[in-house]
Amino acid sequence: MDPIDITYNDEVGFLDDEKRDWKTWIMKLLLLAKKEIGKDNNLEMSINFVNEDRSHEINLKYRDKDRPTDVISFAIEDGEDSIDLAAFKDDPDFQEDIGDLFMCPSVISRHSKEYGTGFDREFGYTIVHGFLHLNGYDHIEPDEAKEMFGIQGKVLEDYGLPLYPDQLDEGRGK
């Protein structure tokens, strides 16, 4: 399976961690997610690490939510404007740009403490969640939520990150 072409914009120094190669960690996790949803074409995306002020600003402007959040997804192809990717399936150079994630490590860290999950698990949960949104998954309706959280849980489990007892049906489980 081809790697995902990820462009990083790190406004907070998250990737400067000397203890872990986050880019490799993220790539391995997202390749599992890509495989789980049956995507075999080339993908490109951006991941932006932002502080709480920037997360709050984006969340307020685009989602009308007056607080910082862990991840915000901006899918390139969504709804009526989607293109038929079948026309490009035989083009080995075509990369589907799925969109942009804005992640706030400090909110993820706070959530990991609130939920008792640990940072790795919460970060994995959050980035897979955003990746699935970029690929058209949602959790507004119960059947959509069950599918999305089921995929999310399987990917986390396959990666060795802990699950809650009802992770495969209910998301965070708390």
From Swiss-Prot:
Protein name, as recorded: Endoribonuclease YbeY
Family stated for the protein in its record: Belongs to the endoribonuclease YbeY family.
PROSITE patterns listed in its UniProt record: UPF0054
Source species of the chain: Lactobacillus acidophilus (strain ATCC 700396 / NCK56 / N2 / NCFM)
Positions of Zn(2+) binding: H129, H133, H139
One Pfam family hit: YbeY
Gene Ontology molecular functions: metalloendopeptidase activity; RNA endonuclease activity; zinc ion binding
Chief location: cytoplasm
